[in-house]
From Swiss-Prot:
Entry annotated with the keyword Transferase: no
Protein name, UniProt field: Altered inheritance of mitochondria protein 6 homolog ARB_06966
Sugar-modified residues: 91, 184
GO biological process terms held by the UniProt record: lipid metabolic process
Organism the protein comes from: Arthroderma benhamiae (strain ATCC MYA-4681 / CBS 112371)
GO molecular function, one term: phosphoric diester hydrolase activity
InterPro entries: HAT_RTT109-like (IPR051236), PLC-like_Pdiesterase_TIM-brl (IPR017946)
Predominant location: secreted
Cellular component GO terms held in the UniProt record: extracellular region
Keywords per UniProt: Glycoprotein, Secreted, Signal
Family statement drawn from the similarity comment of this UniProt entry: Belongs to the AIM6 family.
Compartment(s) where it occurs, according to its Swiss-Prot or TrEMBL record: Secreted
Length: 314
């Protein structure tokens, strides 16, 4: 796949030397039609990217947040269907970063996530005389019905910050791109599903009968939770299973396996997906074995810091 992409790019780039294997007339045709509207696919912004059930953990650490989770710097598809941003509220602005010392005035929820999301969604939902109204396709051209989970981890003063987050979603809301709940009973899927986590106040989520945001369910105890509140629930893997032996052929012993199976079963009975965070990233063999085990046991999302490795896993 990689070689074919590179070969096509070499043929079509006018700045490159002619390819000897092709006749000169064909080379000229390929070069001269490169920018013609006839040969431009209208929703090609994510063309060829296959979505994978991976959560881009601490996505804002990446060289290019949001975009890297979709396509990596090397143009090798990543296709993560879930991304996460930590936010701090200061002076009515939502800044993105893991801790306060890492914040900058340029890195905001708006600049790193809302605006890029709108940019991609506008490209995957172009105006067309061939459709009767606006479309609600997701960010992945190969699977337009796949939602993108946007987790917003509130790091300070959740009660005060959450209304600002709801307000920040307005561009996505106006374009009808958000998954929503109507009258506390009707689930309407959309291109983007927002899930509040960290310091997100549960009371401000469940109090709205009509809303376009959800809550990260507490996987340890889902009493009182439904998929209308929490489409996905999460918890720390380490807190559930304790120490994991990296030198063992099987990363989880029978007792540990039973613990996660019990949680996954309880969540599935409520139609709630499961994600485990704080999963070891090293040694590589252990990480991969844990991914394999968790996926086999039925989690909805695999937590990944190395999205390239996760893509290779699938």
């Amino acid at each position: 796949m990689k070689s074919s992409i590179l070969a096509s790019a070499a043929i079509l780039a006018a700045s490159l030397e002619p390819v000897a294997a092709l006749s000169e007339p064909l080379q000229n045709i390929l070069i001269n039609t490169d920018r013609s509207p006839i040969y431009r696919y209208p929703t090609d912004v994510t063309r060829g990217i296959v979505p994978i059930p991976v959560h881009s953990h601490n996505d804002y650490w990446r060289d290019i947040p949001f975009y890297t989770a979709l396509t990596t710097k090397l143009a090798l598809s990543a296709g993560c269907i879930s991304i996460e941003a930590d936010v701090f509220l200061f002076n009515d602005t939502l800044y993105v970063g893991h801790e306060e010392s890492a914040l900058t005035k340029e890195r905001t929820l708006q600049s790193l996530y809302i605006e890029p999301l709108m940019n991609v969604l506008k490209k995957t939902n172009p105006k067309s005389p061939f459709v009767s109204g606006p479309t609600r396709h997701g960010v992945f051209d190969t699977s337009s019905g796949q939602t993108l989970y946007l987790w917003i981890d509130v790091k300070n003063d959740g009660e005060k910050a959450w209304p600002h987050i709801v307000k920040a979603l307005q561009p996505l809301r106006d374009a009808n791109y958000l998954t929503k709940i109507q009258n506390n009973e009707s689930f309407v899927p959309g291109p983007v599903t927002v899930i509040g986590t960290g310091g997100t106040p549960l009371s401000q989520v469940v109090s709205a009968a009509d809303r376009d945001y959800f809550y990260d369910g507490p996987l340890k105890d889902l009493t009182g939770f439904t998929s209308l509140i929490s489409p996905i629930a999460s918890t720390s893997l380490m807190e559930v299973v304790g120490d994991i032996k990296s030198d063992s052929e099987n990363p989880l012993n029978p007792t540990q396996l039973e613990a996660i199976r019990k949680q996954i079963k309880a969540a599935k009975e409520k139609s709630i997906g499961v994600r485990y965070w704080e999963t070891p990233g090293w040694p590589i063999r252990l990480r991969n074995e844990l991914w394999r085990t968790l996926w086999k046991e039925g989690v909805a999302l695999l937590n990944a810091d190395d999205v390239n490795a996760a893509k290779g896993y699938f």
